Amino acid sequence: MDKQHSKQRIVVGLSGGVDSAVTAYLLKQQGHEVIGIFMKNWEDDDDSEYCSSNIDFVDAAAVADVIGIEIEHVNFAADYKDRVFAEFLREYQAGRTPNPDILCNAEIKFKAFLDHAMRLGAEKIATGHYARVRRNESTGLHELLKGLDPAKDQSYFLHRLNQAQLSKTLFPVGELHKTEVRRIADEIGLPNAKKKDSTGICFIGERPFRDFLNRYIAKAPGPIKNDRGRVLGKHVGLSFYTLGQRQGLGIGGVKARGAELKAAQARGQRGVGEHEPWFVARKDLDTNTLWVVQGHDHPWLQSTVLSAQDCSWVAGTAPAAGLMAAKTRYRQVDATCELRSATTANCELVFAEPQWAVTPGQSAVLYQGDVCLGGGVIAASNVPNTLPTVSTRSTPELLVK
């Protein structure tokens, strides 16, 4: 067994899903001492129909039994509530749209979980993420790379990981395609081989997002206006909407008027008719107004420049300015951009082509080829000057601290 695969104590985050199960199996086959940890990160809905935690633990325990490893149930719910969920609520309250999975990875799975694993004497941790870690021999730094399966790559969610975290982390299934992972699970008889992949935010489950958020943030109704200032209806609270949103606006039957259609034609919008769908374009917290526009290619939905804050760089220092690629949302195709400036805290990107519905609170993540450089939280993007300025001076009441 070579040095890379010399026997080590490795703690695997077993979620009950097939990816982490195959991760544990592959490491056990390599001769490592593997210990499974099931992370319980949410307990507010333990008795509800939306909580799958108990079922997931049963699945994880069954996997551990088949593979022949120990499994421990560890409760990180308090850490999750303090470090992830509280920030999630603050961001929504301020009119932004956060990505809690990114914060969960940085604060829970690769911090609290990593710390727990080290206390167990682990040399490494491993998870079922579709990403790769590579040590650059010339720089001595650990690089975060996209997973080999482009349809499953999760490096976007991992861009906040630092050198200390990456040096202790393995992503075995990042070297595989999902079809191979399913095949391995089926061949060795894993009980969750055909289990459906989890989707969405873990603590929300399958319930309607608005119903969940309304438990914590009070409704604050206000007007819905189009780009010419016409009132089209009433919203339930700005926190319950995100830029680019099309469904759930309650104005599906509203048609554009003649003057509005002419204005769209003058802007060069192609194919805009009175029955075109409406999209959320801006949330103005000063006036509690939800601004919507008609047509997917409306200029209010297009941005070529964005600024990001709270940046985190995998190498530990900001990359040099220059051409690279970026994603402003998960599953987006890499977009060519110029990194105009970058510090340890902020960066500015200029895109070769307009980006659709760039959303404050989401993350802009930078790449050079398959290498993820890091990124930051989108703070603002360039939009027409006629668009009202977003302010956070007036925010809805936070029901639960």
UniProtKB/Swiss-Prot annotation:
Its EC number is 2.8.1.13. One of its GO terms (cellular component) is cytoplasm. Residues 152-154, 329-330 are annotated as: Interaction with tRNA. The active site is at 104 (nucleophile), 202 (cysteine persulfide intermediate). Its main location: cytoplasm. It is found in: Cytoplasm. Disulfide bonds join 104-202. GO terms for molecular function: ATP binding; tRNA binding; tRNA-uridine 2-sulfurtransferase activity. ATP binds at residues 13-20, 39, 128. InterPro entries: MnmA-like, MnmA-like_C, MnmA-like_central, MnmA-like_central_sf, Rossmann-like_a/b/a_fold. PANTHER family: MITOCHONDRIAL TRNA-SPECIFIC 2-THIOURIDYLASE 1, TRNA 5-METHYLAMINOMETHYL-2-THIOURIDYLATE -METHYLTRANSFERASE. HAMAP family: tRNA_thiouridyl_MnmA. Catalyzes the 2-thiolation of uridine at the wobble position (U34) of tRNA, leading to the formation of s(2)U34. Belongs to the MnmA/TRMU family. This is tRNA-specific 2-thiouridylase MnmA.
